Amino acid sequence: MSFQRLWAVRTQFLLLWLLLPAVPVPWAEARRSRVSLPCPDACDPTRCPTLPTCSAGLAPVPDRCGCCRVCAAAEGQECGGARGRPCAPRLRCGAPFSRDPSGGAWLGTCGCAEGAEDAVVCGSDGRTYPSLCALRKENRAARQRGALPAVPVQKGACEEAGTTRAGRLRRKYNFIAAVVEKVAPSVVHLQLFRRSPLTNQEIPSSSGSGFIVSEDGLIVTNAHVLTNQQKIQVELQSGARYEATVKDIDHKLDLALIKIEPDTELPVLLLGRSSDLRAGEFVVALGSPFSLQNTVTAGIVSTTQRGGRELGLKNSDIDYIQTDAIINHGNSGGPLVNLDGDVIGINTLKVTAGISFAIPSDRIRQFLEDYHERQLKGKAPLQKKYLGLRMLPLTLNLLQEMKRQDPEFPDVSSGVFVYEVIQGSAAASSGLRDHDVIVSINGQPVTTTTDVIEAVKDNDFLSIIVLRGSQTLFLTVTPEIIN
């Protein structure tokens, strides 16, 4: 084809293009509408409109300019438009589109931001939800009715026994970093305060960790982290701080549930199936030991079912997860997660370097379901007595290890080894210390932790004989009464 011919075709094409009518495109129109309502150069909160009352379960969120606060749109509600109404957290504005009659811009519809993968979740109410968004939608409706919202307790349907699917994260080189990035926003730092008898001011007494299990502020931690008549302050990864109240506590399981009232919805962790965990699998422990937030340790699982009897807990029905992931003071209550980011345990106990234990997630799930059932029936937890000790019976192996580490360890063949005294507790007030050995309570010999538990349960006043190094001490303690 000649040059003149090509030039003629090009000219005809340009003329046809110029004669075509402009066709409005939704996203192009939406883009022009955003240009027509630019954000201010400087934010002046005094010029923000009065915030209307938001729908139940929805908190105010920053507008698209990050200046004023507006009511977010819930799932299925309109978003975008001339003023760019945002969606609630974890929702996105998308199709179907419609035109905003007030400004000519295009309105979208808020929908679930999660993908289809692993969408199905099981709620603490025993119902299977098609996605986290569906559960959140049901919870918003429940709050409007004054009903109790459900907590997501696992991935997959409620009737499923879990899967052994090897997630993609387990095949990546930076799998630890990927897990931490996913899990850390849901891990919280707990700071406990007590009132000084001299100044009558609240001073820090101890710290621990926990993790968020509901978007409205339910947090799981260890029971031994909490003590009676103390202020509990929760600090999120964002730095926001809230005062917490105790909702449920079980000292036998060493599990507790506390509640904060956040300004916005919180990121949650889902419980995996600890029964699916395999020996040799990588795990990651997160927490805030020594008040150092976002502390991460990793290790492998030695056994998934270290029975309480193996630890000398003859009457214990708990099977612990043993790992070499380091769990230090303050790490208690933090999550132990697999490489998919699912909670498979709660950091609980360190016996010695390289030997740590976690309460399995299946126990946590049952604890949450029992709490949910009690709330529905209007039953409050029973009052219990609390001493404030973490202890183990002196087995032969433990006795040999302690004598190897400490030549001054008491020359004793039986008793209960106190590996931690909870600060601010009745035990601490009585003078008990870490690494004491309890050999007698109220004139009765003590050889197992059950002996101590039964003595606390049956008596309002305890006379305790303790071995500390080469000393024999006589202490008295009155257990605390807690809910």
From Swiss-Prot:
SUPFAM superfamilies: Growth factor receptor domain, Kazal-type serine protease inhibitors, PDZ domain-like, Trypsin-like serine proteases. It is an enzyme of class 3 (hydrolase). It comes from Mus musculus (Mouse). The keyword Secreted applies. Residues 35-113 form the IGFBP N-terminal domain. Disulfide bonds join C39-C65, C43-C67, C48-C68, C54-C71, C79-C93, C87-C110. Residues 379-471 form the PDZ domain. The gene is Htra4. Its main location: secreted. It comes from the Eukaryota. One of its GO terms (cellular component) is extracellular region. This is Serine protease HTRA4. Residues 208-368 are annotated as: Serine protease. Its EC number is 3.4.21.-.
